[in-house]
A protein has these predicted regions:
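Active-site gating/metal-coordination segments in enzymes
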Residues: 55, 63-158, 167
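Mid-to-C-terminal alpha-helical segments outside catalytic/metal-binding sites
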Residues: 1-51, 55, 107-108, 235-240, ...
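Alpha-helical scaffolding within the catalytic cores
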Residues: 38-46, 72-78, 102-104, 173-176, ...
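Conserved, mostly hydrophobic/aromatic
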Residues: 9, 77, 81, 90, ...
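A cross-domain feature marking catalytic cores of carbohydrate-active enzymes
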Residues: 10, 60-61, 92-96, 119-121, ...
Length: 282
């Protein structure tokens, strides 16, 4: 039986991500989200999600080449998903700038039972529309893995001189259009709906049904009305609910999503139905 909701965007609130991969970035992100990150053990995280009847999609992380910071290994997420299989599923991550190593790791992610691959073009400093990276996306398609891309602005580096060297243009949604066109069998999820280029992403999703949008990283009550209009209407089958924990809490995101007062069938699609379909759950 499916849970009440599936949180499509959950980072590990543990030291390996917050103090390792995110070292030097957390303070700016906390200021951007106007909220302290909530640190947690995996035991406590699992209990938290059980208590609200939500499944969490845990995300690995690998931006070693661009940031010089350690990765969250795919094995860490796979182990957590096995240990807490009632409440966690997960995505691996590859560093696109590692070339053939990244391509090989896609197969390892699939073999580990993970459901997709997480990319952060701005932190990984790569342009998804550069065909040099397309063997990675072809491998995702071959193995039936979802490709989840950060899109739009980023709380990481926000409000800092030079944005801590992080380029937002790498995460502009239009860069995903040629990827989706060249890989029609690849399910692409554009996280955070690409603001401030959200209309660009809406156009892509209307044109290409293999492109989905997640609403994580946003207080639902602050989602732009043009995005909410498409969520209620033409794109209700391509939106995914998520929190971006530990920056925003699932409890808050659920409560504010409920307050949007969507039709029951649309709310169910966005909260769990669309995610369950592309994750092949239930």
């Amino acid at each position: 039986m499916l849970p009440r909701a599936i949180d499509f965007h959950v980072h590990l609130p543990t030291p390996d991500w917050l103090d390792g991969s995110m070292a030097g970035y957390v303070e700016a992100a906390e200021a951007y989200f106007r909220s302290p990150v909530q640190r947690s053990t995996l035991d406590d995280l699992a209990d938290r999600y059980r208590d609200i009847d939500v499944m969490a999609v845990l995300l690995a992380w690998d931006a070693e080449t661009a940031t010089g910071r350690p990765r969250v290994p795919n094995e860490t997420v796979a182990d957590a998903c096995r240990a807490y299989s009632d409440v966690f599923t997960g995505f691996g991550s590859v560093d696109p700038r590692k070339g053939d190593t990244a391509v090989a790791e896609v197969g390892q992610i699939a073999a580990a039972g993970l459901r997709g691959v997480k990319f952060h073009p701005s932190l990984q400093a790569f342009a998804p529309d550069d065909p040099v990276y397309w063997p990675i996306f072809a491998a995702c398609q071959e193995h039936g893995l979802i490709a989840l891309f950060h899109t739009g602005t980023s709380g990481i580096g926000a409000g800092q001189p030079g944005g801590q060297g992080i380029r937002l243009d790498y995460a502009q949604p239009i860069r995903l259009d040629p990827v989706a066109a060249a890989h029609p069998g690849l399910t692409i999820v554009a996280a955070h709906f690409g603001w401030p280029w959200h209309m660009e992403l809406i156009a892509i999703a209307l044109h290409k049904t293999n492109v989905y949008l997640d609403i994580s990283g946003w207080s639902p009550r602050r989602i732009p009305p043009e995005v909410t209009r498409e969520l209620r209407g033409r794109l209700s089958g391509q939106f995914l609910w998520g929190s971006d924990f530990p920056f925003l809490t699932p409890e808050r995101c659920l409560a504010e999503f409920d307050a949007l007062d969507l039709p029951a069938d649309v709310a169910d699609q966005v909260l769990r139905g669309n995610a369950a379909r592309i994750l092949r759950l239930g």
